[in-house]
Amino acid sequence: MKHIPRKRFGQHFLSDQGIIDAIVRAIAPEPGQPMVEIGPGLAALTQPLVERLGRLTVVELDRDLAARLRQHGQLDVIESDVLKVDFAQVAQALNASKIRVVGNLPYNISTPILFHLLAHVRVIADQHFMLQKEVIDRMVAAPATSAYGRLSVMLQWRYAMENVLFVPPESFDPPPRVDSAVVRMVPHEAPEALSMPVLEELVQVAFSQRRKLLRHTLGRWLEARQFAGTFDTQRRAEEVPVSEYVALAQECS
């Protein structure tokens, strides 16, 4: 029986074989590698991955799809909302210090998923995700550009990232109304040590009114914390490089 894509799950199934092959080449799975796929859907990417890996863990929220996937002998199925999955526990279950994570992420909750994985980054070797191209543009954006924002700072602090593949709407069934792309995310081996909640709060405050000078937003936040250091607040949030936000978070942690 044909599966009807569920709008509430943001389901758009990959159907272009050429694109699927290109994604698998970008991921470059090796036999025995511990890997988790988020949102396997109709297994378009799952099948070529598991053929190369031998075994694959998948996270699927849709109960009908999860039931189908369980019939595949080489898949371990976690039927759950990915935002509730403890990836450290998954790594432990796979006897792995680090796992690889891949997926065609639901576009309506892609940012929360990225932040959820950021909290588990210590057990992640790398990530390859299909996302809305506009989201990837924000992830990899440089300072002083309109795409540079909270997502850019939080993810660039912890990952080296690159856009590895453009994916047009007609590669999906049903086609989304936006262009897509695949991003590669490799955690930095020795990231700057800091309090992640402090960096998160600091960056959120800084970009809360991005057109205003930082003295109106971050300046007040620093005053409230009785910050005694020096930080130029006569700039807009988008003009401050990641390294300066990180250094400030370290001073405030």
Swiss-Prot record:
It is found in: Cytoplasm. The keyword rRNA processing applies. One of its GO terms (cellular component) is cytosol. Its EC number is 2.1.1.182. It catalyses: adenosine(1518)/adenosine(1519) in 16S rRNA + 4 S-adenosyl-L-methionine = N(6)-dimethyladenosine(1518)/N(6)-dimethyladenosine(1519) in 16S rRNA + 4 S-adenosyl-L-homocysteine + 4 H(+). GO terms for molecular function: 16S rRNA (adenine(1518)-N(6)/adenine(1519)-N(6))-dimethyltransferase activity; RNA binding. Keywords: Cytoplasm, Methyltransferase, RNA-binding, rRNA processing, S-adenosyl-L-methionine, Transferase. PROSITE patterns: RRNA_A_DIMETH, SAM_RNA_A_N6_MT. InterPro entries: KsgA/Erm, rRNA_Ade_diMease-like_C, rRNA_Ade_Mease_Trfase_CS, rRNA_Ade_methylase_Trfase_N, rRNA_adenine_dimethylase, SAM-dependent_MTases_sf. S-adenosyl-L-methionine binds at H12, L14, G39, E60, D81, N104. It is an enzyme of class 2 (transferase). Belongs to the class I-like SAM-binding methyltransferase superfamily. rRNA adenine N(6)-methyltransferase family. RsmA subfamily. Specifically dimethylates two adjacent adenosines (A1518 and A1519) in the loop of a conserved hairpin near the 3'-end of 16S rRNA in the 30S particle. May play a critical role in biogenesis of 30S subunits. This is Ribosomal RNA small subunit methyltransferase A. The gene is rsmA.
